[in-house]
Amino acid sequence: MKPVIDYSIYLVTDTVYFKDDSIYNKLEAALIAGVTLLQYRDKSAETRILYERALKVKALCDKYRVPLIINDRADIAFAVKAAGVHLGQGDLPPLIARRMLGSDAVIGVSAHNADEALKAEADTADYLGCGAVYATATKKDTSVIGTEGLSKISAATKLPFVGIGGITLENYKAVLQAGANGAAIVSAILGADDICQTVRKLKNMALEAKSVKI
């Protein structure tokens, strides 16, 4: 059975945080505090290292019952029995990834505009990662779509989606107000002085947003 996903606080890793094993303490702190979904993204690691790190991240996610998504690599997602995979526009087509991982896999697709969102929906994606919402040091070669871009995507598709790119405690609410189901966050969590406090603040804002919608 496909897992029910809460996209509200979607933690995404980055290569820069894998310089030493302290990353696993950071991830555990975030999971304890209430991260709802975790994506293992590590663009520069070799396949064997990707696999070994993914196993460690998967063990943490299992401990706190948080689904794990693997960035780009359907083979790694299959190998570690992750909940699914997140695909960029230049990665495997979603239909092929689903064939590899099965009908219960959670397939996410990056979308920068309404056309890409509709294409992903037609290709059986389960959710979208939309951005960059704001300028970000994590991905310097990406275009900024702003909250206006999120609103256009929200109007075009019924798929759940998260905003990604430059999202912080200060602008998280604006992302939700633009129609997003949550936000994919890297530096604002993993680079925080107090990871637990940061995640708890995000969690409170997400709960407030849900109560307003109800």
What is each PLM-predicted segment?
Residues 1-92, 99-127, 142-145, 152, ...:
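Conserved N-terminal beta1-alpha1 strand-loop-helix module at the mouth
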Residues 43, 133-136:
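A short, flexible beta-alpha/helix-coil linker loop
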Residues 85, 183-184:
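Paired acidic/hydrophobic, glycine-rich loop segments that form the ligand-binding mouth/hinge
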Residues 178, 182:
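C-terminal binding/interaction regions
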Residues 92-95, 136-137:
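A short, polar/charged loop-to-alpha-helix boundary motif
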